[in-house]
Amino acid sequence: MEEFQGYLELDRYRQHDFLYPLLFREYIYALAHDHGLNKSILSENAGYGNKSSSIIVKRLITRMYQQNPLIFSANDSIQNPFFGHNKNLYSQIISEGFAVIVEIPFSLRLVSFLERKEIAKSKNLXSIHSIFPFLEDKFSHLDYVSDVLIPYHIHLEILVQTLRYWVKDASSLHLLRFFLHEYWNTLITPKKYITLFSKGNPRLFLFLYNSHICEYESIFLFLRNKSSHLRSTSSGIFFERIYFYVKIEHFVKVFFDNDFQCILWFFKDPFMHYVRYQGKSILASKDTPLLMNKWKYYLVNLWQYHFYAWFQPGRININQLCKYSLDFLGYRSSVRLNSSVVRSQMLENLFLINNAMKKFETIVPIIPLIGSLSKANFCNTLGHPISKPTRSDSSDSDIINRFLRICRNLSHYHSGSSKKKSLYRVKYILRLSCVKTLARKHKITIRTFFKKSGSEFLEEFLTEEEVVLSLIFPRTYSSSRRLYREQSWYLDITSINDLVNYE
């Protein structure tokens, strides 16, 4: 935000809500690419100078408003070699600049929200791992859960109408509408839907999707505010660019008759919880399945009549938590019963009391993770390590550091697993794949490589957590079990590794 504040004079734009002129500022496209103007995509691909991007954007916008914006004459291609490139580049130029602009009012409201709520450590709440302590605390007391896939077919006009709450500039909204209709086919995948969380997804569409989800989840916040007369704990919504997180405590009986074609009833449920991650959401409750069914049909009517997205009720399944596993964010989570026997003696009578307690467990699913490693050529489909092809000029230290970085990132992300057996197998695959890669480069056998490198090579693959724990605890059977079940959640993880994002 400090970078935006210096460039854009946000106080003035906040008063007038007029963002259209920012499309023709050079520094907008420098911010979009996160580096200087000398290395912008406009100068790299077209050979233009530092101050040519605004001219190109003006020409693209002019052609967009014409009847045939994608038809370029032969003279234009000769005089301007930029227009001879792929048409996808044109849409990329405008979309990246547009994304920076429309995020300005969104960021301003986010900052004001955090200041109003006096949230000092909002960065910790932005971590992906911050969801799991909440699940451990709440889900062990719940009975039923629904894993909902949020519809991805979103009408273009719905996206524009959603953005009207954030941007009040009519010129920007008109340009956005033209842009979406003209370049829709070049910005989406061949399957005609948005791949929302892929690496190559345009930044603008991520923002539009998050704004759309924000409006959907604001209805939950509205219900929580309407039930303020009930005894409830404070909760709120924390906005991010990609992930949204909200916790709902109480609901009260209300009904809508404006946006829906039927009356919907909501009953008080003090144990209803909601979590969204990427394009999916989880609803969990302690009450009977009847209440979960009511929420199921509420979601169906919400998407169909308010957002005009076709949604089948059969896509929402209600399951018992004790018999169901949740696969999300690279973990497989479930609620299991842990039995413990307590021996009690009163005078001459001996009693054995069997206590069953629910515990929320998170493990690493090994089969999908091996599939990701296989696609990245670290192993075959059966999990056997293989050597990776390397460049001839790559040094041994570069190859080792690359494998170490991948191994430590995976260990860091999966540190919350209650069982480390799957994680140890992944580390074994990466370590042996590194050895085979180096042996292939030097044209020697694996045994010869181990004789030259010694045991120091294996110690490099130990993570910092394992080194610290091995120094604190003596190497006994109890300490190894403690190391095997040690769980750690980190509040600095804001993105998912490509090998983990196999969903």
From Swiss-Prot:
GO cellular component, as recorded: chloroplast
**Can the keyword tRNA processing be found in this entry's annotation?**
yes
**Keywords assigned by UniProt, alphabetized:** Chloroplast, mRNA processing, Plastid, RNA-binding, tRNA processing
Which Pfam families does the record associate with it? Intron_maturas2, MatK_N
Q: From what superkingdom does this record's organism come?
A: Eukaryota
| Sample GO molecular function, one term | RNA binding
Sorted alphabetically, which PANTHER family does this protein's record hold?
A: MATURASE K
Q: What does this protein do?
A: Usually encoded in the trnK tRNA gene intron. Probably assists in splicing its own and other chloroplast group II introns.
Give the protein's recorded name: Maturase K
* Name of the encoding gene: matK
